[in-house]
């Protein structure tokens, strides 16, 4: 089973250029998905990545890579990964819904003015 890394291109603590290169070096065969992961709270203070749908965070990229390496060595449970994937998708869906409602609310306020 191919490893999958999810990294955010919007969070302040994530340097996408260096992190992507380091993850590619760690596992050249892994799938890397870049985009908002709806993990904004921790993403303001820590660099993070989702590894096989499991969130990992650290204060530095080097610390994060140590955690990623340890996670990759652990045996994978397909059922657990599927549960985590669904949870991550639901979290993203809720964030998109909140963003949509906020945009609608702001548009209504502009229309009133």
Swiss-Prot record:
Signal peptide: none annotated. Residues 78-113 form a coiled coil. The keyword Transmembrane does not apply. Residues 69-113 are annotated as: Disordered. The keyword Metal-binding does not apply. Pfam families: DUF1450. Keywords: Coiled coil. Residues 74-105 have a biased composition (Basic and acidic residues). Belongs to the UPF0741 family. This is UPF0741 protein SH2399. It comes from Staphylococcus haemolyticus (strain JCSC1435). The lineage of its organism: Bacteria, Bacillati, Bacillota, Bacilli, Bacillales.
